[in-house]
């Protein structure tokens, strides 16, 4: 019988790789928690119309990449390709706007797009995202960019570049769209096939083409920054001056338009030169019209998403992930000893120590070898004799020093043992 394997574009994550994921999640929770962002959890699948209306039917994500199907109730359903639309749907449905003020939200989880799998790009991939809803202030744009920068810096990542642009408001984009089409039309035959199609329905996306010839043509295209109205210019100037005041370097990139139709004003990406073609680690911007487009009140908003797979690739390049060290590896042999070991392991774990209990039932020699490989600070040894006498042998695995203790002394002086374990770690 043929074995069943994971689908193309998906992967299982085990140790030691999982340690990098845990490292990222810990830093994210710390940074966002201190900035008072509230975690939300939204469904993995939504009505297809949410993404058609929210992301835009002309985008590649909606027209080519979504996992969509009709369920048994004849409802069109889509596995979420990104997180913002679902977060906004929840914001509207739960009437969070009625609370007044600014809502700072964040989420993490799997997303799904039918793409060609490659390094840093999977069909099931994972993102962390933030959404700030209810503020049109340029400081909100700067806050989310500063937090993204902080997360990446705390992870120790280098060779990063914040790419910054403004796509203005609807009127700005319409004026620019006309100028861009006028410029590109004479070059239509030289554009790649996707860009020729986009020229008619979504010309700004041509600026984001990965085709070399199209990129060369786009380099001389008019800049959207020259088509910003006074309000858009003022907003973008304030964003830039605040980033400068924070000491956050950025590069103006007039070709940066992002792949989703809902963006307005600020658009940005954080890219890594260590990732090759899939260089974008974080992408986001302002989306002042999305809440109203999805049936809510006019609500300004800004956010970003970080791709976790690409972060993990960068962290792996830096070296081994630093996971928590195991305190005790507990070995036992004999009926009474094995029963006592279960109780001792539970009590130590409840007290806050990490304990791995050997469940193999093999000879002590084999258990000791596993203890040496476990990375534990100390090995606890229980035989039937120790179990009867309420004792335990403790062996420090680095120094090989060994002593016999009463279990009551071990459990009764946990703070003293905690200090000893901390000293052994250093």
UniProtKB/Swiss-Prot annotation:
Transmembrane segments: none annotated. It is an enzyme of class 6 (ligase). The gene is hisS. Homodimer. It catalyses: tRNA(His) + L-histidine + ATP = L-histidyl-tRNA(His) + AMP + diphosphate + H(+). Keywords: Aminoacyl-tRNA synthetase, ATP-binding, Cytoplasm, Ligase, Nucleotide-binding, Protein biosynthesis. The keyword ATP-binding applies. InterPro entries: aa-tRNA-synth_II, aa-tRNA-synth_II/BPL/LPL, Anticodon-bd, Anticodon-bd_dom_sf, His-tRNA-ligase, HisRS-like_core, HisRS/HisZ, HisRS_anticodon. CDD domains: HisRS-like_core, HisRS_anticodon. It is found in: Cytoplasm. GO terms for molecular function: ATP binding; histidine-tRNA ligase activity. GO terms for biological process: histidyl-tRNA aminoacylation. This is Histidine--tRNA ligase. GO terms for cellular component: cytoplasm. Its main location: cytoplasm. It comes from the Bacteria. Its EC number is 6.1.1.21. The lineage of its organism: Bacteria, Bacillati, Cyanobacteriota, Cyanophyceae, Oscillatoriophycideae. Belongs to the class-II aminoacyl-tRNA synthetase family.
